[in-house]
Regions:
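An alpha-beta-alpha
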Residues: 42, 127-176
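Structural motif
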Residues: 53-73, 180-195
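Extracytoplasmic "Venus flytrap"
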Residues: 22-48, 54-65, 85, 150-156
Length: 215
């Protein structure tokens, strides 16, 4: 009887700990762009059973990023998303010290450790659509492009935009203004104004704030 009771018993196990997911943002979720969409995803994960999330926003690219990523790794986060290209070196540096933590880096190309992965989107497809629209609505045949940094992701977008525009309107001129920032509303607005002053009547932007649209 004792054996039967033992065999039929259900052994209680401790509840599984929640998976902790961290996000490092280069700007604020209120940018209505890149960081905003990442944070929508974070909120969706937070709503799932068995997950908790943390977001650190307005983290500069550089030594501060190392500190922020380390903070998440030290506080028990199992998966960390570093959501800006400029976090690439910091991500790989910290990942080497925390082999049990998984790291996902946005739009990068260096995966120095087995626990580092990269992700991106086919953003150039949207740029093709923008180029088509620009070619068909411009009156001045001058269009502008506000670009953040000269990295592969951004250059792919410029090429897609420009090639599609010229395909439908060979007389179009494309002027590019580099702002060397992802999120700086003042710089983005100034770039848009400069393009307008030079005759552009259609402007695309690969930056994070809506400032160019508010000119």
């Amino acid at each position: 009887l004792a054996s039967a009771l033992t065999f039929g018993a259900v052994v209680a196990t401790p509840a599984q700990a929640a998976t902790k997911v961290g996000c490092i943002y280069v700007g604020p979720p209120g940018d209505l762009g890149w960081t905003y969409r990442h944070d929508i995803g974070r909120q969706a994960v937070e709503a799932l059973d068995g997950f908790t999330t943390t977001a650190l926003e307005n983290v500069p690219e550089g030594p501060e990023a190392v500190e922020a990523i380390t903070q998440l790794a030290e506080t028990g986060h199992d998966l960390i998303f570093t959501t800006s290209f400029g976090f690439m070196d910091a991500t790989n540096e910290v990942a080497g010290n925390y082999p049990d933590v998984k790291f996902e880096h946005a739009t990068g190309y260096i995966r120095a450790h087995e626990n580092v992965s990269t992700y991106s989107g086919r953003f150039y497809e949207g740029r093709v659509v923008q180029g088509y629209i620009a070619a068909n609505v411009t009156k001045s045949n001058k269009i502008g492009y506000i670009a953040s940094f000269p990295i592969p992701e951004v250059i792919r977008g410029i090429n897609a935009f420009m090639l599609e525009a010229k395909k439908h309107n060979p007389d179009i001129e494309v002027e590019i203004v580099w702002v060397f920032t992802w999120f700086d509303p003042a710089k983005e607005a100034a770039a848009a104004q400069a393009l307008i002053d030079n005759g552009a009547d259609v402007i695309a932007a690969h930056t994070d704030s809506p400032a160019p649209m508010q000119i």
